[in-house]
Every structure is written in structure tokens, then in C-alpha cells.
Amino acid sequence: VAARRKKAVGAGTKAPPKAAEPAVESTVIDTSPPYLALRLRASITEASMVPVFEAICEEIRRNGAHRVLVDLRESSVELSISDMLGIAKMTASNFSGVLERLALLVRPQDLLSEKFFEPSVSSRGVPAFATSDAAEAKYWIASKTKLPR
């Protein structure tokens, strides 16, 4: 009876709102070699880029991933070239020597800005590839071909 009362009392109360967390879904894809697929559903702006980056980093570390495909097709990217350079530097400083490959799957309208990100990260030691073609991204991330360092 006490349990019923407790439920009834708590049923009408609302929990305090949580701070907005980036919606990052992760799945380990069991190919040879395996990779971590992350799907991001958030608007990426100057204000949200650090929390989004931290959420992605947490998933990579939690899964011990060496290859990561980040699907940004359900996100909107509203970053300046300067912001993209900042993200590239953060990515390299966190994952140079850790990630073997990083693929970004983006909407066609976001491809131009992400193509700036690709060489910025790759030149800092994290092989990166940006595309709007899902098959191309999956092929590249799972490829066994050794990349030049």
C-alpha cells in the first residue's frame, strides 16, 4: 500500500529539467576491423560545439574505438571556418595516435565546410574523411589499407 501511495504522490510531480545534453547514439559495428558508428542529432553552433565534442569523446573512450564514423546527417552545422579549425585542433590533441581513421558523414549542403575540417585534422595526425555518401564513408572507415603517416 505504501508503494502505491508513493507512486501516486510522485506521479504528478515533474523532475527538474536537466541541462541539455547532445543526442549522441553509438553502435559498435562488428566488421574486420570494427568501428564505432556515432549518430548525432543536434544543432552544432559555437555555443554547443564543446559539449557536442565532449559527448563524442566520451563515447570514443568508453568504447575504446580506433575507427569512428560520425553521422551528422540529422544535425545542422552552423560553424565558422574559425570554429571548424578549433574543433580540428581539439580532435587532433585528443586523438592523434589513438584514432586510426575518422569519417564524417554529412548532409550535402554541409560538405564544403566539413571538407575544410578533413585536411585540418589529417595534417595533425588523425586520418579523416568527410563525405555525404554513406556507402563511401563505410567503405573508407572499414578499409584495411594502411594510410601514410
PLM feature spans:
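Amphipathic, Lys/Arg-enriched alpha-helical "gate/interface" segment within cytosolic domains
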Residues: A2-R149
